[in-house]
Amino acid sequence: MERFIERLMYSARWIMAPIYLGLSLALLALGIKFFQEVFHIFTVIISMKEVELILIILSLIDISLVGGLIVMVMYSGYENFVSRLDLDDHDDKLSWLGKLDAGSLKNKVAASIVAISSIHLLKVFMNTENIADDKIKWYLLIHITFVMSAFAMGYLDKLLRDKDSPH
């Protein structure tokens, strides 16, 4: 009975496979939104103010950072929790594949979230005349929370690595 339960639990990891595959659809949706913004820029670029152009470009950077985050979570999550990707014979294999454990992935995700939040905060600061002061304070507080959380996770990870390594 115990062996059956253990095999069933181990096989349950495959439930995550369609979720990681679904992230590729989210990536496709993000790509469509990205190019929608690019095409929109070219239709109004002559009449657009410089600040508006910069805000749209920051949105494009934001989209690309989120896309990179999706790729990282999709591949690393699949490799860490479902199965190894058999890509040894591919010339274009990503150099970090197979090297990110769950802890490293967590730290990279946290760093990506801080970068995304930074871009969003920069957009807020460039558009302060249209945003209420209390909302700006909340955006800043949330960003500081992300930064502190990422720092704390990185520091704890370092402490654990130092504890596990021989001196």
Curated annotation (Swiss-Prot):
Keywords: Cell membrane, Membrane, Transmembrane, Transmembrane helix
GO cellular component: plasma membrane
Compartment(s): Cell membrane
Membrane topology, from the record: Multi-pass membrane protein
Main location: membrane
Keyword Transport among UniProt keywords: no
Pfam family, one: UPF0114
Family matches, as InterPro entries: UPF0114, UPF0114_bac
Transmembrane segments: 15-35, 53-73, 109-129, 136-156
Family: Belongs to the UPF0114 family.
Alphabetical list of HAMAP family matching this protein: UPF0114
Protein name: UPF0114 protein Tola_1474
Species per Swiss-Prot/TrEMBL record: Tolumonas auensis (strain DSM 9187 / NBRC 110442 / TA 4)
